[in-house]
Amino acid sequence: HKKETFNPKKSKEVIVKHFSLPAYDNEEQAIEEEVNKIKSNKWIINNNCVLFSKMNPDTKRIWLPVIDNKKLNVASSEFVVMESPNNKINSFIYNICLNSQFIDYLKANTTGSTNSRQRVKPTIAVNYKLAIEDSIVKKYSEIITPYMEEMKILRSEIGKLTQLRDTLLPKLMSGEIEIPDDIEVNNDELSI
C-alpha cells in the first residue's frame, strides 16, 4: 500500500492529474485539476499502481491508471493504492482485485454497518494472502500485460473522443459550425 501523500496546501504544483471516484465513474477518465480547488490530501501515484475503492466492496471500482508523465498524478484517499515493485505485474494485481474471492475477503473485513457506509482498511487489502508461485505470476503478467496496456490506450482515446464530442456538439447544435452540404452522410454507417 502506497503511503506517499500530496498536500494541496503545501504544493507548488498548479495543475495535477486527479484520479477521483467521480472521474472513475465518468468512464475512468482522470481530470486535470487546479491544485487550489483540491480540498484534501491525496495519494501520489505512478505507473506501478493499481487503485481500488475502499468504499463498498460490492461496487467494483478497480482502476489501472493511465499516468500523465508530464504532471503530478494524485488519487483520492477513497482509493486503496496497491503499488507493485514494477509495472510488469500490475495486470496480475488488477485482476486479483477483480476476483470474487478477493472481494469476498474485503467484504468480510469491512467496517461500517450498511452498504453505503462500508469501508475497507488498506492494511486489510495488503494483507490478503495468495499461495501462488512467482513464476506463474510472471508468466500470467507476460501474457496479459499487453492486453491491459491496449486497454489503457483505448481508454485514453475514448477520453479524447469524448472531449472532442463535448466541444463540437454544442457548436453544431447552435449553428456556430456547420457540416458542408457537399458532404454525403451515410445513414446506415457511423462514417461521413
Regions from the PLM with identified roles:
Residues I15, S20, I31-E34, K70, ...:
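Glycine-rich, flexible loop/turn motifs
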Residues K2-F6, P85, S191-I192:
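Alpha-helix capping/hinge segments and adjacent helical runs
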Residues W43, N47, L51-I103, A108-I124:
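A short beta-sheet element
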Residues N87-K88, D104, T111, N127-I192:
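Amphipathic alpha-helical coiled-coil/heptad-repeat segments
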Residues E4-P8, M55, T59, S100-Q101, ...:
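A generic secondary-structure signal for well-formed alpha-helical elements
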Residues S20-D25, M55-N56, D134, I183:
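Short, small-residue-rich loop/turn micro-motifs
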Residues H1-V50, T59, L64-V66, V74:
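Sequence-specific dsDNA recognition surfaces
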Residues S20, V81-E83, K129:
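Short, well-ordered beta-strand micro-motif
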